[in-house]
Amino acid sequence: MKKILFFLLTVAFSGFLTLNVTGQSLGGRVTDLDGEPLAGASVVVEGTFQGVHTDAGGYYLLEGLKEGGHRIRYSFMGYETQSREINVTGDVREDVRLKPTAIITDDVIISATRAGDQTPLAYSNVTGEILEKQNSGQGIPYLLSLTPSFVETSESGNGIGYTSLRIRGTDASRINVTIDGIPLNDPESQQVFWVDLPDLASSVDNIQVQRGVGTSSNGAGAFGASINIQTKGIENEPFAEISSAAGSFGTFRNSITAGTGLLKDRFAFQMRYSDLRSDGFVDRTGSKHNSAFFSALYRTGKSLIKANVILGKELTGIGWWGVPKEILEVNRQYNPAGEYTDEYGIVRYYDNETDNYTQNHYQLIYSRRMNDYLSLHSALHYTFGKGYYEEFREDAGYSKYGLPQVSIGEITFDATDIVRRKWMANDFYGLVYSLNYKKDKLDAKLGGGINLYSGDHYGRIIWMRYPGSTESNHQWYFNNGEKREASLYGKADYSLSERLSVFGDLQYRFVNYSLRGDDDDLKDIGQSHSFSFFNPKAGLFFRLSSGQEAFLSLSVANREPTRTDFKEAAGDSEATPRPERLYDLEAGYIFKSARSSVGLNLYGMYYRDQLVPTGELSNVGYSIMTNVEKSYRIGTELTAGFKPSGFIGLDFSFTLSSNKIVNFLERYIDYNTSDWSEEYKSNNLGTVDIAYSPSITGSSDLYANILPPLKVHLISKYVGRQYFDNTMNSERMLDPYFVNNLMIDFEPSLNSLRGASLQLLVTNIFNAQYESNAYGGNWFEDGQEKTWAYYFPQAGTGFMLRLGLKF
């Protein structure tokens, strides 16, 4: 399999490099109205992959153009974009002067945390057009599926409800996520729960995915990847949009979006409301979601004030336990959540085994352009979250809840059936800011943020079969976590010559995290930790020729453990997790021509004290982690696009990697079955694969324009085998899978509408039977290894039909 893939990719790579390297050329200079050069301005041949950026003197050169007319787009942040029809016959010169925008735009909001065109890092930009076409209600991880080294997972099996992601094997708790430059990660778990932001994609303009350490950002430490989301800007004209979808597994999605357009060239308002429902593929993982997005804007010539409100509410059937290995082959939709045996010996399921949560985001953004070179951006943010999950517990011991035994007549009960709720209530607020300077050869940014978090965790028993004197809604535990985080960064791109620029990025980050109170097992988890991190980054960007670029960078990142990491080690100083450090080396090459593009990236990520998953989960579905002294991820990422004609095209990505722990020491208990005595043992397994890190991933989008309004996509995804613990035992391994989706888009031109679209999406068209995630572990009896494992099976063939109307 590897040899076949390598051969096909080599052929494709060779073919891309030989396409369109000869032909006509177009060159010139891009300046402002005073004739000052605009270094780094974008010059793009519309409708093709081809584009370049101006050098330090503002000069550009497009080579390999076909003879004839081309539409060229010239753009630079803070200036009005120009598009020109240019007839290329022979070598043509075209100089362009760009006019400063009279009004500040939304782009300044996210410029400080994003990789620019000359930043020496590996990243992918996902446009709003792509997000809109792929958005059938699935979580954001499924809309980013085609980016390199990306693996998405779903508890319900159909991408709705609880979803998550990994990039280069890096789990979601290490991936920094911002929305309009504002941190989105939960400070304690350091994850983003996309289920709490249903249909967010309908309000997103574009997303940048940075692989590796990336640029300095706000909020949680980026320890392997970053996701930077920009919400939709304000439309100039009034508009309204309606989108409705229905499909397999009882899935329905409806959304309405409307906006006033610019009023008096100063004010604008827009809103979106979405309702999303699904039964899920796995039994009793159905979900109901409601979300709303409100945005109001006021702007003058040099200032912009924007207020965003994002509201999300979800009710989801619990599916985080997965399917036991012994049942997987018999019933892929089995869900053990809420299972119990009644007094007649009949297996039943508690009908309200659900997760219920509300999360609201409030953001106030201010940006001001001081002059043509200097701008200020700042934002205040507040996130409120509150909710619980409810579950039935059979034969729950009174002592585990700090309760006395109950006597009824002459019978004394030490256990009873209960229904309990575990609550979370949290507040997260802060300030982020950046000062941006861009003139001639220098593009510099100074920024940072201060963020505060307080989260309550508590549990209540709402029903007991034999309550005794215990009152309803009895609270059996309470703890609070507080986190304070402050950061300061400075970053700069400087053009040393027409072909070479240098990049530097320095960040200081301070974190204090404290826990107090008892956990659900009644143990005191009180503790406090402080960390100071210095995260330097440096790199070089080379402009080899028109259409060819290369980069090299070295970055350092540090990350503190999560709440679960600390909680699981409470009371054992030797088990207290250590912070992690990552050294990330990236080298890349980019080639673009009119009909093809290729990106080749080599990376080496070397860790000290990396926290890796043991394969086990906590009782709320978090991975239990352990520090390993030395580990690494090295790999090659290939991205390519090929458009031989206006009729057909292909985009694909492929990653080949090696993800290893050096000298992994397995610790386990060996039980003697004669008397069930325990013997603690260890085994040095040498160099092993890191859990959840497939060595091969790949994706592709083969598309054809059948007729002007009709477009067909065959979207494919391959994920190689991956272990779900660190022992490389085939009993605890996810098999490789290859999944194909068919998408048919029909977009007729209707004079009465601004736009209309009808889409049919057929998922998993070959009905592949696969699991995208699992967890488990082992134990020993009389020296013989045993395995326990739970899997998350994904749905077979399904469909979604979607209608969209724009007014």
Locate predicted features.
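Transmembrane beta-barrel wall of Gram-negative outer-membrane proteins
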Residues: 27, 246-277, 282-319, 365-371, ...
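Extracytoplasmic beta-strand/coil segments of soluble accessory domains associated
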Residues: 141-183, 205
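Gram-negative outer-membrane beta-barrel transporters
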Residues: 498, 604-606, 626-726
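C-terminal beta-signal and adjacent terminal beta-strands/loops
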Residues: 650, 720-723, 746-807
